[in-house]
Amino acid sequence: MKTFSAKPQEVERKWYVIDAADKVLGRVAVEAANILRGKNKTIFTPHVDCGDFVIIVNADKVVLTGNKENAKIYTRFSGYVGGKQVDTPRKIRARRPELLLELAVKGMVPHTRLGRQQMTKLKVYAGASHPHEAQQPTAITL
């Protein structure tokens, strides 16, 4: 018996919606990353983008455990001298609440071209509504 390898044109994509209200950031991110990669499918192939679309709503209501809201640090560097920028989740949540979930999921997908392609299927919204009702997404409970 030969090992099955999925072909990109054979992959059937579905849409899923995750409600992140009062859920722990990492738990939501793990579930989203697994669906984006396609690890929940029997045809999972590591080098093929066989994942589905994921919509995360209520990203502004996601919870961080412990004192991470103030103590965790997100660092960026512009490339210029003195261009290091440090943010806490509290600052990021005030400016752009979707970014917390996007960064968490981004760290859980491969850091390659394939991972960047998989991240394009992630849609994160701060509120409870999203513009993807026409795709009839399936709700996932955590």
Swiss-Prot record:
Q: Which GO terms describe its biological process?
A: negative regulation of translation; translation
- The residues the entry assigns to the signal sequence are none
| A GO term for molecular function | mRNA binding
Give the protein's function.
Answer: This protein is one of the early assembly proteins of the 50S ribosomal subunit, although it is not seen to bind rRNA by itself. It is important during the early stages of 50S assembly.
Q: What family does this belong to?
A: Belongs to the universal ribosomal protein uL13 family.
Query: What NCBIfam families does its record include?
Result: rplM_bact
Please identify the protein, giving its name as recorded. Answer: Large ribosomal subunit protein uL13
Per the UniProt record, the source organism is Akkermansia muciniphila (strain ATCC BAA-835 / DSM 22959 / JCM 33894 / BCRC 81048 / CCUG 64013 / CIP 107961 / Muc)
